[in-house]
From Swiss-Prot:
<dbReference type="GO" id="GO:0004329">
    <property type="term" value="F:formate-tetrahydrofolate ligase activity"/>
</dbReference>
<dbReference type="GO" id="GO:0005524">
    <property type="term" value="F:ATP binding"/>
</dbReference>
<protein>
    <recommendedName>
        <fullName>Formate--tetrahydrofolate ligase</fullName>
        <ecNumber>6.3.4.3</ecNumber>
    </recommendedName>
</protein>
<feature type="binding site">
    <location>
        <begin position="74"/>
        <end position="81"/>
    </location>
    <ligand>
        <name>ATP</name>
    </ligand>
</feature>
<comment type="pathway">
    <text>One-carbon metabolism; tetrahydrofolate interconversion.</text>
</comment>
<keyword id="KW-0554">One-carbon metabolism</keyword>
<dbReference type="GO" id="GO:0035999">
    <property type="term" value="P:tetrahydrofolate interconversion"/>
</dbReference>
<dbReference type="InterPro" id="IPR027417">
    <property type="entry name" value="P-loop_NTPase"/>
</dbReference>
<dbReference type="InterPro" id="IPR020628">
    <property type="entry name" value="Formate_THF_ligase_CS"/>
</dbReference>
<dbReference type="InterPro" id="IPR000559">
    <property type="entry name" value="Formate_THF_ligase"/>
</dbReference>
<comment type="similarity">
    <text>Belongs to the formate--tetrahydrofolate ligase family.</text>
</comment>
<keyword id="KW-0436">Ligase</keyword>
<keyword id="KW-0547">Nucleotide-binding</keyword>
<dbReference type="Pfam" id="PF01268">
    <property type="entry name" value="FTHFS"/>
</dbReference>
<keyword id="KW-0067">ATP-binding</keyword>
Length: 589
């Protein structure tokens, strides 16, 4: 028996579960992955040799494809990863061959306030510590490849400043005439560091680089991470990397990684990360872990490759997308599925009573501050707040319905939830013909997710009418306005002069016609203002800038005050993470 989640922290439950987990070879054998298709990282973690495996299984029929999303979360999150793992365990309890795909946790949120993305309670993936602390090095590979592009750029700028055309020619170089004011990329690091959002580099002498403004972004927002999420084979990975625009010349020509002759080396650094990772739930179901982009500042999806493998090997494959349906699901729907060609069967919409009450609370209600205990007002029964908060749930239901998918609502149950509140939510959804599972997977594991699993199995029997929100023939400005209106609930969109100028240039060029819209926006509100709860009315989405990711083929409108480099809070997790000197194990994750 595993410890009770109510009285035991997640990391201790994980350590106990790890004493009896399957070897990676047993897990692979049960999945029909051959030994020669595994790249082991010890006894319980492996990478899959994707090229070997997929060439063998590509003609297998696809299993049922389930996407897990959520309502607008509180700063604590509402247990989407936990539900993804819990549902996988529940389907396993029902005798189904099942896997799930999740993203690798970034060290930034792990050491800050969000913690690990390993799930919690009795619905976790293991080994938890290794998963949480670097894993197999994929984020480092992305970080190193990204920063190598910046090394190539800044060193080239220095050499062009110091050497004549004749000397450059002797060294096999042509003058690119890079404009230091039009460098598109910054550096990346896998931490949340507000002090690195705006920096100046090259402050030394003639040999120390060109003096210019620069920045650090968090590694998970790198264009390379989006590329890792979206590619389907090695050829595509290399092609997309070579298309990344790092800067512009003084005459306005794009400078790519290919121009800098660094795309091959970047591909070499990314090569190990190309293969998906395999671990397990605490009940022994397979978990694919691949890619790590956030949904608010990036694409927010685990990789297409992980889903392709999971679908070919299993009857059911569960994948999760970041944050709420307004950003994570919208990007899954209109970017990931359009790129992959895969069509999901069912969407699971996760909600909690605390989040619903948060969205329906009075204006003077207590703030939820990450790192601080949840105010008791959101734990205690409050039918008035709950009823008002249902507007947020209804809005997310409407978003998913626009995709044509069947929906199962999952109430991620907490011990403080009352029967009256749970019955109210169930009745609300059932009146719309939507099944609602009251799921206790956090406390009871797969056994607590059986109702959810049963509803999902039934929903998978329906024919999917999945369709996209927009066609690529629609101008990019119109796509942004459509997402703002139909998904976020905005009245209109205001573009800054800079954003409008960039969009007009983009719309005039055919090369951008199939670039997807990937809006960077706060996850804490349907609007671009994180303080607006519920379903804001009478508001305008403000787009302050437009980023273009040529390799990932994404147009990224930046909404409101969102930053590509989060900051570290005053109560970060790193203060409670340590090493037990007697056991040699990490504590506090």
């Amino acid at each position: 028996m595993l410890p009770e989640p109510v009285s035991c922290p997640d990391w201790l439950i994980a350590q106990e579960a790890e004493k009896r987990m399957k070897s990676i070879f047993q897990l692979a054998e049960e999945l029909d992955i051959k030994k020669e298709e595994l790249i082991p990282y010890g006894s319980y973690i492996a990478k899959i040799d994707y090229r070997k495996l997929y060439s063998r299984i590509k003609n297998n029929p696809n299993g049922k494809y389930i996407i897990v999303t959520a309502i607008t979360p509180t700063p604590f999150g509402e247990g989407k990863s936990t539900t993804t793992i819990g549902l996988t365990q529940g389907l396993g309890k029902r005798g189904k061959k099942v896997s799930c795909a999740i993203r690798q946790p970034s060290a930034g949120p792990l050491m800050n306030i969000k913690g690990s993305a390993a799930g919690g309670g009795l619905s976790q993936c293991i080994p938890r510590t290794e998963f949480s602390l670097g894993f197999t090095g994929d984020i480092n590979a992305v970080m190193n490849a990204h920063n190598l592009a910046m090394v190539a750029l800044t060193s080239r700028m220095l050499h062009e400043a110091n050497y004549s055309d004749e000397i450059l020619k002797k060294r096999g170089l042509r003058r690119l005439d890079i404009d230091p004011k039009r460098v598109q990329m910054g550096w990346v690091i896998d931490f949340c560091v507000q002090a690195l959002r705006k920096i100046v580099i090259g402050l030394g002498g003639k040999k120390d680089g060109i003096t210019m403004e620069s920045r650090f972004d968090i590694a998970t927002s790198s264009e390379l991470m989006a590329i890792l999420s979206l590619v389907k084979d090695l050829k595509e990975l290399k092609k997309r990397i070579s298309s990344i625009v790092v800067a512009y010349s003084k005459t306005g020509n794009p400078i790519t990684t290919e121009d800098l002759e660094v795309s091959g080396a970047m591909s070499a650094l990314m090569l190990p990360a190309f293969n998906p990772n395999l671990i397990q739930t605490i009940e022994g179901q397979p978990v694919f872990v691949h890619a790590a982009p956030f949904a608010n500042i990036a694409i927010g999806q685990s990789s297409i490759i992980a889903d392709m493998v999971g679908l070919k090997l299993n009857e059911y494959h569960v994948t999760e997308c970041g944050f709420g349906a307004d950003i994570g699901f919208e990007k899954f729907w209109n970017i990931k599925c359009r790129t992959s060609g895969l069509k999901p069967d069912v969407a699971v919409l996760v909600a909690t009573l605390r989040a619903l009450k948060y969205h329906g609370a009075d204006k003077d209600s207590p703030k939820i501050i990450p790192g601080n205990p949840l105010p008791k007002e959101y734990i205690e029964k409050n039918m008035q707040w709950l009823e008002r908060g249902m507007k947020n749930l209804f809005h997310h239901i409407k978003i998913i319905k626009k995709s044509g998918l069947s929906i199962v609502v999952c109430i991620n149950k907490f011990q403080s939830d009352t029967h009256e509140e749970l019955d109210f939510v169930r009745k609300f959804c059932e009146e719309m013909g939507i099944p609602v599972a009251i799921s206790e997977h956090w406390q009871k594991g797969g056994q607590g997710a059986l109702e959810l699993a049963d509803f999902v199995i039934d929903a998978c029997k329906n024919n999917s009418n999945f369709n996209f929100l927009y066609e690529n023939s629609l101008p990019h400005i119109s796509r942004i306005e459509l997402i703002a209106r139909e998904i976020y609930g905005a009245d209109s969109v205001e573009f800054s002069p800079l954003a409008l100028e960039k969009l007009q240039s983009i719309n005039s060029k055919k090369e951008f016609s199939d670039f997807a819209i990937c809006i960077a926006k706060t996850h804490l509100s349907l609007s671009d203002n994180p303080l607006l709860r519920g379903v804001p009315e009478g508001w305008q989405l403000f787009i302050r800038d437009i980023l273009v990711f040529y390799g990932a083929k994404l147009i990224v409108p930046v909404a409101g005050e969102i930053s590509l480099m989060p900051g570290t809070a005053s109560t970060p997790n790193f203060r409670t993470i340590d090493v037990d000197l007697q056991t040699g194990k990490v504590t506090g994750i």
